[in-house]
Design a protein with these regions (language model features):
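Mid-core helix/loop region of P-loop NTP-binding domains shared across ATPases and GTPases
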Residues: 1-4, 27, 31, 90-97, ...
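A short, basic N-terminal segment
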Residues: 1-43, 273
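C-terminal alpha-helical "lid" subdomain
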Residues: 2-11, 53, 202-205, 210-273
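Walker A/P-loop nucleotide-binding motif
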Residues: 41-61
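The feature captures the helix immediately C-terminal to the Walker
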Residues: 61-65, 249
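Post-Walker A helix-loop "phosphate-sensing" segment adjacent to the P-loop in P-loop NTPases
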Residues: 65-76, 104-107
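A short hydrophobic beta-strand->loop->alpha-helix junction that borders the nucleotide-binding pocket
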Residues: 78-89
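The catalytic "switch" region of P-loop NTPases
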Residues: 144, 156-228, 232
């Protein structure tokens, strides 16, 4: 059994976020889009995709925490709005989800009885009032998977309209097939920034994977930091995870748990078996 202190240390490690090169690049993209809010001209949008386990949700959460809502002159300022495409989305449910995540008062059920035009007007007004500088919409593949033709174009057109009228850049985040949104004429030229979160590949950038392992090792809750950067260990961890960040992190979370239960001073190879 773990002591309360050990549980606290384990939870801290489970919540660790490592910013490796592609993450830094995406954060810089977000910053440029957000800071463009006060400039003239069209507001460019961005498409960010990656397979399951590449860290999309953790990345979004980390960026949002850098710009949390706060009261300014009696108004709740909401610089970064993070939302998602609901399952089997309609125009109304998509807009209602954005309003809900912006902190708009009233139940989603009540809003769904309001037509899309009124929802759009309300959302644009709230975005301006709240000083929103960037909208990040996760799970965008839901729009691709469940909507074809007219309904998908309707939602895509409305998001484009919000981008124009509110003057806020929008980041669309999803699985690789979310790229199909670029087939829509109204979005093909609007997505000026496109990034992909890939799995790690030792054949291309081995140092990035090694740096990630070192970063995780340095944040492990032990008096002696483990050495996980030896070639044999790196290859073993890569073979186990297949370059997937989530798989690697889950494995190391368990290894840290076993080491804490063992009251070990550091993580050793026996905890990695």
């Amino acid at each position: 059994m773990l002591t309360d202190k050990q549980k606290e240390k384990l939870n801290e490690f489970r919540d660790v976020f490592i910013e490796y090169p592609i993450i830094s690049t995406v954060f810089n993209d977000f910053d440029r889009l957000r800071l463009g809010k006060g400039l003239a001209g069209e507001k460019p949008c961005m498409l960010l995709n990656g397979d399951t386990g590449t860290g999309k949700t953790a990345l979004i959460k980390q960026y949002k925490e850098r710009y949390l809502p706060q009261f300014i002159n009696g108004v709740m300022n909401h610089p970064v709005l993070v939302s998602r495409i609901p399952s089997n989305p309609t125009l109304e449910s998509t807009l209602a989800e954005l309003l809900k995540d912006l902190g708009q008062l009233g139940s989603t059920e009540r809003k769904l009885r309001i037509n899309g035009t009124r929802l759009t007007t309300s959302l644009i007004k709230c975005l301006k009032t709240c000083g929103t500088e960037l909208i990040i919409i996760d799970e965008f593949q839901e729009l691709i998977e469940h909507n074809q033709g007219k309904k998908r174009r309707e939602i895509a057109n409305r998001l484009k309209y919000i981008n124009d009228e509110a003057g806020v850049s929008i980041v669309l985040v999803g699985m690789p097939w979310a790229e199909k949104i670029a087939d829509e004429p109204q979005w093909s030229s609007r997505l000026l920034v496109r990034r992909q979160l890939p799995y790690f590949k030792l054949s291309e950038n081995p140092k990035h994977f090694v740096q990630l392992i070192i970063g995780l090792a340095n944040r492990m809750p032990f008096t002696e930091k483990p050495n996980l950067s030896e070639q044999a260990t790196v290859f073993a961890l890569f073979s186990l995870s297949k370059g997937c960040f989530r798989t690697l992190k889950y494995f190391l979370d368990d290894a840290v748990l076993y080491a804490l239960m063992d009251n070990a001073k550091t993580l050793t190879t026996k905890h990695l078996v």
